[in-house]
UniProtKB/Swiss-Prot annotation:
Cellular compartments annotated: Cell membrane
CC terms in the record's Gene Ontology section: plasma membrane
Gene behind the chain: ZIP10
TM spans (from-to): 53-73, 86-106, 126-146, 210-230, 242-262, 272-292, 304-324, 344-364
Protein name, per record: Probable zinc transporter 10
Species of the source: Arabidopsis thaliana (Mouse-ear cress)
GO molecular function, one term: zinc ion transmembrane transporter activity
Length: 364
């Protein structure tokens, strides 16, 4: 399922870049530079190529370190899901993901879709970036909600079957209400606690697995777009700062994703597949940008619209996941609610992560 999502998102990005050649009202006739590459003073094609090759390996390595660190550091309290330190580290990573959506991806989308290279009608008449980001967040909520509902019904059926095998068929199972947490009511006799706890654990694990898959999907789309921008440009001044910022970004975003994958309790094969696709998507985007450098022009209307819309959809997904499924779920959880001190530490971690990534917006 994860592999197909990644291939699907990569295929969409490539398909749009290659096939979308004419949008209604895309080209502003007054701007003659829209079909050409940007003209900067520090353009050096040969040096840029060396920096791009270096960026592929450096981003790949830092991404692998970030996403795999939670898997192999279980002896460290900060990477043990049952420990309070894990919530603090996860809050830091969630702040990075939140800032990525608000400070990096969404502003780029607004800038691209309001470019003078696009005609006033319709691109300057309507805030497409905000609209697409909003619809992306709503769509993510819909997928999140419907998927959880489907699997919750399946879990209830399994629970009824377990109870029926022990109790009489006419005995009812207590109502289970799911909204971030599981609230138990009445179950017959000695099965009350055991079965309700089992269903609660099942639903919580389900939430973690949905979270891990949807979060990875959003990160993959965003990473391909970022990689495209690195692979396409020959501006050495831009690449240097961008690569350094991306290494920092990928490592800590990988830690956030790795923590979610760890909580999902996948087998080692699926963990390896998800970590691999996270690590290779940005380098893949760089290679794709290099391959399309002759046809992909960052200021062309086709590229501005395609990348702008992809950025907007990715931003909506990342913002939703960071606020709803990561931060809200943890801060409203029992462990956080029982400790004001832990909440304050976690808020500080969120601000530190979001603040650090906001500063990185100067270069990336």
């Amino acid at each position: 399922m994860t592999k197909s999502h990644v291939i699907f998102s990569a295929s969409i990005a490539l398909f749009l870049l290659l096939s979308i050649s004419h949008f209604p009202g895309a080209l502003s006739q007054s701007n003659k530079d829209c079909q050409s590459k940007s003209n900067y003073s520090c353009i050096d094609k040969n040096k840029a190529l060396d920096l791009k090759l270096l960026s592929i390996f450096s981003i790949l390595i830092t991404s692998l370190i970030g996403v795999c660190l939670p898997f192999f550091a279980r002896s460290i309290p900060a990477f043990q899901p049952e420990k309070s330190h894990f919530l603090i580290v996860k809050s830091f990573a969630s702040g990075i993901i939140l800032s990525t959506g608000f400070m990096h991806v969404l502003p780029d989308s607004f800038e691209m879709l309001s470019s003078p290279c696009l005609n006033d009608n319709p691109w300057h008449k309507f805030p497409f970036a905000g609209f697409v980001a909003m619809m992306s967040a709503v769509f993510t909520l819909m997928v999140d909600s419907i998927t959880t509902s489907v699997f919750t019904k399946s879990g209830r059926k399994d629970l009824r079957a377990d109870v029926a095998s022990v109790e009489t068929p006419d005995q009812e199972i207590g109502h289970v209400q799911v909204h971030g947490h599981v609230h138990s009511h009445t179950l017959p006799h000695n099965l009350h606690g055991e079965n309700d706890k089992e269903l609660g654990s099942y639903l919580q694990l389900l939430r973690y697995r949905i979270l891990a898959i949807v979060l990875e999907l959003g990160i993959v789309v965003q990473s391909i777009v970022i990689g495209l921008s690195v692979g396409d440009t020959n501006n050495t001044c831009t690449i240097k700062g961008l690569v350094a910022a991306l290494c920092f970004h990928q490592m800590f975003e990988g830690m956030g994703l790795g923590g979610c994958i760890l909580q999902a309790e996948y087998g080692w094969v699926k963990k390896a597949v998800m970590a691999f696709f996270f690590a290779v998507t940005t380098p893949f985007g760089v290679v794709l940008g290099m391959a399309l450098s002759k046809t992909y022009k960052e200021n062309s209307p086709e590229s501005l619209i395609t990348v702008g819309l992809l950025n907007a959809s990715s931003a909506g997904l990342l913002i939703y996941m960071a606020l709803v499924d990561l931060l809200a779920a943890d801060f409203m959880g029992q462990k956080m609610q029982r400790s004001i001190k832990l909440q304050l530490k976690s808020y500080a971690a969120v601000l530190l992560g979001a603040g650090g990534m906001s500063v990185m917006a100067k270069w990336a």
